[in-house]
């Protein structure tokens, strides 16, 4: 079994974050990642489509984190950006937005689902996430920057969502949600922190490696792709 490849699928660069994508990419590669997704919030996109850096042995994926409180408008944004993005994330935070994201198979990840006194998920939404293949994002930055009762609440929400994810087989994605280079953590630090937060070792590995790779495979299908689960093999690929 080869060494796992790790991916951070939510990194914010200027003008959303503090650092340029080149700086974030260089440091992420140094920390041990195989790739990151540049996922600026949709209300803080650069005026021009950014040129993604080319780094040997490392890939920068084009992503976005959609911010929209109106479910109908959110679906419109998904349609607008889906074809041009490797990774499409929705910034949750209300039952209506969470539902709209989790019921849409064109969405890859739902980040920040919690709101008011809710963890953001329930049995119905967890089932929808599993059926539509929408992953729940576990974002490190809010946890690392929180203290006291706020952190306790966030950990409680995470525990509740983990239980639902396990029960309904909902995919999870671990990501830094970095707004600067100072928010980045190595894969080993991320895995260790995830386990402290309640994830099992295999769950954390899947969330930082297996699930991100599945997302890219889904959104960048090969030439023999028909639909999910069906692929036409030709020639030597059959054997």
Swiss-Prot record:
Keywords: Cytoplasm, Endonuclease, Hydrolase, Nuclease, tRNA processing. The keyword Hydrolase applies. GO terms for cellular component: cytoplasm; ribonuclease P complex. Its EC number is 3.1.26.5. It is found in: Cytoplasm. SUPFAM superfamilies: PHP domain-like. It catalyses: Endonucleolytic cleavage of RNA, removing 5'-extranucleotides from tRNA precursor. It is an enzyme of class 3 (hydrolase). Pfam families: RNase_P_p30 (PF01876). Its main location: cytoplasm. InterPro entries: Pol/histidinol_Pase-like, RNase_P_comp-3_arc, RNase_P_p30. One of its GO terms (molecular function) is ribonuclease P activity. One of its GO terms (biological process) is tRNA 5'-leader removal. Belongs to the eukaryotic/archaeal RNase P protein component 3 family. Consists of a catalytic RNA component and at least 4-5 protein subunits. Part of ribonuclease P, a protein complex that generates mature tRNA molecules by cleaving their 5'-ends. This is Ribonuclease P protein component 3. It comes from Methanosarcina mazei (strain ATCC BAA-159 / DSM 3647 / Goe1 / Go1 / JCM 11833 / OCM 88). The lineage of its organism: Archaea, Methanobacteriati, Methanobacteriota, Stenosarchaea group, Methanomicrobia.
């Amino acid at each position: 079994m080869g060494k796992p490849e790790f991916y951070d699928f939510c990194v914010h660069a200027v003008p959303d974050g503090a650092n340029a994508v080149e700086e974030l990419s260089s440091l992420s590669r140094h920390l041990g990642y195989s790739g990151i997704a540049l996922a600026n919030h949709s209300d803080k996109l650069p005026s021009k489509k950014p040129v993604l850096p080319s780094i040997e042995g490392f890939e920068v994926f084009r992503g976005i984190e959609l911010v929209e409180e109106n479910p109908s408008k959110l679906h419109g944004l998904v349609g607008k950006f889906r074809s041009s993005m490797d990774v499409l994330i929705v910034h949750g935070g209300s039952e209506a937005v969470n539902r709209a994201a989790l019921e849409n198979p064109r969405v890859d990840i739902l980040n920040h689902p919690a709101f008011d006194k809710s963890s953001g998920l329930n049995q119905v939404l967890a089932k929808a996430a599993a059926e539509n293949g929408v992953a729940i994002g576990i974002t490190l930055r809010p946890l690392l920057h929180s203290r006291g009762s706020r952190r306790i609440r966030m950990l409680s929400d995470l525990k509740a969502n983990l239980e639902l994810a396990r029960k309904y087989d909902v995919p999870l994605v671990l990501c830094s949600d970095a707004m600067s280079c100072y928010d980045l953590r190595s894969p080993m630090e991320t895995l260790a922190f995830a386990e402290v937060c309640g994830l099992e070792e295999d769950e954390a590995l899947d969330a930082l490696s297996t699930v991100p790779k599945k997302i890219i495979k889904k959104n960048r299908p090969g030439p023999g792709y028909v639909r999910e689960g069906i692929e036409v093999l030709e020639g030597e690929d059959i054997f």
